[in-house]
């Protein structure tokens, strides 16, 4: 066994990680090279470990705890306006550092790439096996550097094992590469993976087209930074631009993204339409729900598998609405009206907001709350649970309160537009509406016929209980509709995370193409962008954009935000477009509160600002994360990002 310890810059200073231990004494838990490289099983065990450590923002990711963490009560949707979370009351960013763990993965990948060839002959590995395994390492390296560059900008670029023999620690003090250099390395690694990998594998392992699919994502990010970023940080010693990419490079990166996405065309991937029908909204809804649970789906390009009891997550437990919970957790993801308003199928005000009023300014009354959503885009219905809609055979009971006054000619707006007052404390509403303080002790109301009603729904919202549908909607997307209620407990879910699907490839291709059209590269790019968007709109049951000439960049982005909602992608999109500070400038997101009218057996909806008055203001320094202070102390060549 080798006794020389190999390190990457992430592990400097040695004493801080190794406790100043003798580096020539092999740790007792280190596996020898013969065990790893001597058999196919050893290699597969290594690959399983690095695949598991690969940075993916999946079911076990949260912005405060990072990657591969069991306690994932927060998601990136809480930072984008997609959803409210009772534990998130203002704008924020990813507070967990992704630095040292990245370089530890990289060290292992480099060691594998450098060591495997020397074992090929004596272990009897074929050229095809060695190529595939090496290609997987290049793929994971590209993914790891992409996870870093989208957070920090330029980082120390290490592409081989660094040998440390105990003398010159300063040799491991590597300055940051430019952001452009890191993206170029990512592109090169994906290309090398494409060269080495086979055309077909199980979706949990990379193949040629997996590499190109992720290349399309990474290069789209790079192109956006080149075009939209304004931050500029230059290392005074190396003169490299650590944050930002020259704007004249945008076209090249968009073209790389477009070409990579187009390469997947005709390679066996397609939009999931197994239950879809062009004329049946119910089928379109069911198809979009089923898409995330069909193991044979040809839309899946790369997945992360889970399996009880060894590999689990708690997504269902944390995110089901209150009435469906069987543990101490629920309702951490609550879709906002601001999100819902992006979708088609609703009456609108002149300003584009959903309209809940008639021509006289009175609330429109409904026999059933689902009547309001009769024409809603099926993709939206598959993403959120509307009040009164079914989940696991049970209607979502979302009700803010019971309206008691006679309705006369009609009910006018309960509170002034823009109000964040609580209904139970506002003089205009506290005596007209009966509400429940919390979900444990419901207030009961009796109508003129002696019928008794809980004042608020079983899933809220309540006066003073955050375990509820905070914005009036339940959450559906990615929740297992077939999971038995008694199994909806912490760390019991084991359904698959789909990290890359063909729907995203079409979105990447459309956006890159439209950006190329805007850069005067030809009408054919706008036409291709339109064709991609139209396919997604048709599958979603959305309104179809009439023609390519009607397509805009905002429409392309909106389609992305609808299709990829709650898949932990939109936060990164808003970052690369550099628009979060425009959307979050003392912003309070909107809610849609359902009310039942006593003695009338009717419903109405009140559109309003979030009752808890959460306010979001994005700090533009968050477009680049701070490099951990300890790493800068250990490596003086590292330059901190702006604003920290």
Regions found by a protein language model. Give the residues of each.
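Membrane-proximal, proline-rich intrinsically disordered regions
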Residues: 20-65, 372, 384, 628-644
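Long, intrinsically disordered, low-complexity segments
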Residues: 20, 102-105, 185, 279-349, ...
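Conserved, well-structured interaction surfaces
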Residues: 38-60, 77-152, 169-208, 369, ...
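Bacterial Sec-dependent N-terminal signal peptides
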Residues: 3, 16-41, 142, 186, ...
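Bacterial N-terminal signal peptides
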Residues: 8-16
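Short coil/turn linking the two alpha-helices of tandem helical-hairpin repeats
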Residues: 149-150, 156, 201, 218-230, ...
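Short, surface-exposed recognition loops and adjoining beta-strand edges that mediate ligand/DNA contacts
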Residues: 61-77, 158-161, 198-213, 226-334, ...
